[in-house]
Amino acid sequence: MSLRSKGRPFAVATALVSGLALIAPATADAHRSHPPLAVQQVNLVSDQAGKAALQDADLVNPWGLSLGATTPLWSSNNGTSSSTLYSSAPGSSTATKVPTVRVTLPAPTGQVSNPGTGFVLSNGTTSAPARFIFATETGQIAAWSPQVDALIGPAEIKATTPGAVYKGLALATTGSGDRLYAANFAQQRIDVFDSAFHPVTLPHWAFRDSRLPRGYAPFNVQTLNGRIFVAYALLDAQTNDEIAGPGRGFVDEYTADGRLITRVASRGTLNAPWGLALAPAAWGLPAGTLFVGNFGDGHITVFRPSAYGGYHFAGQLRDTNGRTLAIDGLWALLQGTATTGGTDALWFSAGPDDETHGLLGQLRR
């Protein structure tokens, strides 16, 4: 099930493997420029035959991705109201679906892996922390534990916010315990939940940016290095969908308690930004380099941290022919682990053809 409106045509040719390069813009500071960074796009799973190494009908409009330290990759399949798991060894050109686990929930978007002891679930006889937690476009927070819940069956709905449309989810540790952060696109705010799934009352200033133009709302939220990054897109209040277009987007960085640290990016190459990830260390970019993926045009922009605070535009991923990389319907960006994909790989998810299909793959150096 998808709650999203249609009619946003976007055509991009896909292949199983294609070459990409990161090209710094001519305006970048010369003494801090980096040579072109060549990477590969490896398409591993799709619902369509011939588009990737593995075909899986469940993978329609895969949105959020998450990984535990040693788990397979979890995908939120918005189009089939499911979450499925995939294994892929570092450097592999194939992926395997885990057949023993399939979690169902309505229109999932963002998701997180929970390594802690909070967010406890119980079935009356057994209690254990949720290991994976999801946000949905129906305004719900859902959770699942292999010790408590069926391996093939529904996730537990733990919180429902009337009128909310959650597009993204993050998890962070604070002085008051672990917290969930949900990007409530329809109501234009970040909703926070404690480790018992109870809503947290925020100060009036929390996760507020007075410089943000009217009509922009949190489209995604991501925890990176203990900081909370929020990607903003222009809201269509009639459909609760984003309004894509060149320059339509902002990214902010906050503390875990919601204090604005800096504006990361404004307009420019942003186009309904959603994917947020740090560059893998093996790619040779400065520590803290941020990748921002656009849902609107499928481009990935690179922002380099400044020694004086803030971030600098540092180019976009391009293919080896010099064309800007475009992944149709791009959603998540997520660094791999030593067991799933490798720490030098960046997983991506996408809902091509106006979210009617799905693609899961990696970007590798």
Question: Which residues does each predicted region cover?
Answer:
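Secretory targeting and sorting signals
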Residues: 2-30
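Sequence/structural signature of beta-propeller domains
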Residues: 28-365
